[in-house]
Amino acid sequence: MNRKGNLSMTTQLQHLTLPEDIQQKLLSYKEQPISPEFQSLIGTSGYEAEDEAILFDAIIALAMGKNVLLKGPTGSGKTKLAETLSSYFHKPMHSVNCSVDLDAEALVGYKTIENQSGQATIEFVSGPVTKAMKEGHFLYIDEINMAKPETLPILNGVLDYRKMMTNPFTGEVIRAKSGFGVIAAINEGYVGTVPLNEALKNRFVIIDVPYIKGELLKQVLMSQSALKDEKLIDRFITLSSDLIVQANNGQVSEEAASIRALIDTCDLAAYIPPRRAIERGIVEKLDDDREKAAVRNIAETLFE
């Protein structure tokens, strides 16, 4: 790593005023060489929160070898936080997107037939869990509570003090390389989710990730969206605030209040009328006609 990168990293860490030993641990990760094939898996920073403790505590937990579970509503920035952590630790992050169809092969890997010099051989292709463990990288499990409960026990040994797993397809015992860490995310109350069983939940340090609001949201929209009209952005911030209230009251689903959807909408509003942008970026993502009407009503009061 060059001197400029080292100075940049040091500045980031001083901004958070992390304990000296934690800073040194992060700087040591920064010095470790990363194989070119994994360089693109290192996340980019950019997560913002009103409460600095969210990022601070996540860094401390990961640096101490803890597994971190990010809990929060849809679009509150959990994935962006995970990418920011990957950036701070300068670690590639292998991702698993959970669904009811998730199986052991999607986690661990699968066998395939390869043709070498005219001979058919069976090879094992590593999955994200296997790669992250062997390389000492981060593993990100998104929407972990979307997976079927019977799929997840394969991770129990990976997530406890042993940090090991027996590959069910090859019999290989895999012990995680130093530096391996797990970040998972859940959307509570989301359709299709199931409660995490206590044995799995107890393997994590849990960090709540709420929606961002007000001036901080304005900074995010100004920096991360194509829209630069401050007056228009202020109206979108009011829209977001109203939608968060309605989502908390159960009048609209969390998708309507998603910060990710709001950024998409602001991007569109840089080129098309705001209400049409809201239709494309927020309203049409909703399934319930009453929710669509509620969002449209708010939009009509804020935008001509």
UniProtKB/Swiss-Prot annotation:
Keywords: ATP-binding, Nucleotide-binding
Highest taxon, organism lineage: Bacteria
Family matches, as SUPFAM superfamilies: P-loop containing nucleoside triphosphate hydrolases
Transmembrane segments: none
SMART domains recorded: AAA
Gene Ontology MF terms: ATP binding; ATP hydrolysis activity
PANTHER family, per the entry: MAGNESIUM-CHELATASE SUBUNIT CHLD (PTHR42759:SF1), MOXR FAMILY PROTEIN (PTHR42759)
UniProt protein name: Uncharacterized protein YojN
Classification lineage: Bacteria, Bacillati, Bacillota, Bacilli, Bacillales
